[in-house]
């Protein structure tokens, strides 16, 4: 029993009071003199799978109720961040990407239409709940298969890891940049980017990009950051 069916069910309020040294099991000690890492927010991801269910299974009133429950600070849980996938993830209807055919590194045959069918409208509904409060980050599970050593979006295919081809680092940087530009052209600024998801996990079952820390350093320092700066 995962308890997932109770994910949005309101629970009994927890009442805080003065600490009791005799009972340490529920004692929280707050040291106001020490500040550590700042939490920017808490959120979720609108994957293709969730967007598909939202767009096809809910009527307008149910859609509004779902968005209020997720993103409204007063009537819902007040999520304040979205982590959007750049292309397919392990929660998609079927694997897809925005440059399916091998092409020049500038990606002249870029096609963003798949994102616009169900994902983008769902993201826009979420952002409309409290305009300006929700920030969006982007993460890529895998670039198109032709950019990878195994020719597949999967992390492992035919017993070969799907690492990034040495000659496709710039193509991949352009791929991520174009995604950010597509969102920006629709009034959605991407707050942060991670170049891949779970880099140590090469899955046979879903899109993944195995990447060592040195490969990630090379990608970010020599390709991704300079491409961002140029655009």
Give residue ranges: language-model regions.
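Gly/Pro-rich turn-and-neighbor structural signature
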Residues: 202-231
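N-terminal catalytic cores of secreted or lumenal carbohydrate-active enzymes
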Residues: 8-190, 211-214, 222
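Core alpha/beta catalytic barrel or barrel-like domain that forms the active/cofactor pocket
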Residues: 139-140, 192-198, 231
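Acidic, contiguous N-terminal accessory segments
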Residues: 3-4
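Active-site clefts of carbohydrate-active enzymes
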Residues: 147-150, 200-205
């Amino acid at each position: 029993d995962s308890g997932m069916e109770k994910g949005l069910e309101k629970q009994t309020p927890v009442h805080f009071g003065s600490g009791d040294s005799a009972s340490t099991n529920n004692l929280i000690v707050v040291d106001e003199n020490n500040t550590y890492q700042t939490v920017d927010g808490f959120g979720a991801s609108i994957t293709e799978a969730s967007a598909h269910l939202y767009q096809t299974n809910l009527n307008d009133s149910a859609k509004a109720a779902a968005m209020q429950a997720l993103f409204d600070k007063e009537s819902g849980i007040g999520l304040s961040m979205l982590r959007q996938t750049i292309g397919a993830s392990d929660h998609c209807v079927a694997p897809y990407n925005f440059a399916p055919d091998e092409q020049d590194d500038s990606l002249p045959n870029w096609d963003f239409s798949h994102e616009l069918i169900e994902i983008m409208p769902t993201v826009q509904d979420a952002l409309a709940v409290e305009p300006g409060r929700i920030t969006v980050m982007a993460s890529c599970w895998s670039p198109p298969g032709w950019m990878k050593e195994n020719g597949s979006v999967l992390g492992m295919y035919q017993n070969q890891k799907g690492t990034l081809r040495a000659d496709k680092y710039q193509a991949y940087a352009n791929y991520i940049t174009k995604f950010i530009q597509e969102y920006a052209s629709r009034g959605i600024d991407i707050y942060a980017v991670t170049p891949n998801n779970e880099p140590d996990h090469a899955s046979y079952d879903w899109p993944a990009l195995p990447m060592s820390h040195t490969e990630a350093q090379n990608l970010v320092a020599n390709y991704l950051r300079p491409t961002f700066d140029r655009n």
